[in-house]
Amino acid sequence: MHLFIGVSLRPLGHGIPAPYAVEDICTAKPRDIPVNPICIYRNPEKKPQERRGAGAGEGQDPGVHKPPASGSCPGPTRAFGRRSFLQAPGPTPRTMRRTSSCRPS
């Protein structure tokens, strides 16, 4: 009985395509891959870029600039003018920013 079931189901197994390993998922076609892969495309000829601000200003927030050396800058300036009464008291990073030219922009 087991032999009969095995022999009768064998032709059905030949009709199902067998999964095979794809060498490079980034060049394979979507139908060849059973899942949705994420490919990271890199150009091997291109050298990695150095981070901006590396050196003396390392570890600083890129949005914060140093004030001018003259010392005439009064400090952070408001980016959006006066605060309304609905805003929380005190400066927030969104409403306060430091400018390099000491002029509000």
UniProtKB/Swiss-Prot annotation:
Biological role: Most important serine protease inhibitor in plasma that regulates the blood coagulation cascade. AT-III inhibits thrombin, matriptase-3/TMPRSS7, as well as factors IXa, Xa and XIa. Its inhibitory activity is greatly enhanced in the presence of heparin.
Record region (Disordered): 38-105
Subunit structure: Forms protease inhibiting heterodimer with TMPRSS7.
Gene Ontology terms: biological process: blood coagulation
Organism: Gallus gallus (Chicken)
Signal peptide residue numbers: 1-17
Subcellular localization: Secreted, Extracellular space
Biased composition regions of type Basic and acidic residues, renumbered to the chain: 43-53
Cellular component aspect of the GO annotation: extracellular region
Entry GO MF terms: serine-type endopeptidase inhibitor activity
Principal subcellular localization: secreted
Record carries keyword Secreted: yes
Protein name: Antithrombin-III
Top-level lineage group: Eukaryota
Entry's family note: Belongs to the serpin family.
UniProt key word ATP-binding: no
Keywords: Blood coagulation, Hemostasis, Protease inhibitor, Secreted, Serine protease inhibitor, Signal
Expressed in which tissues: Plasma.
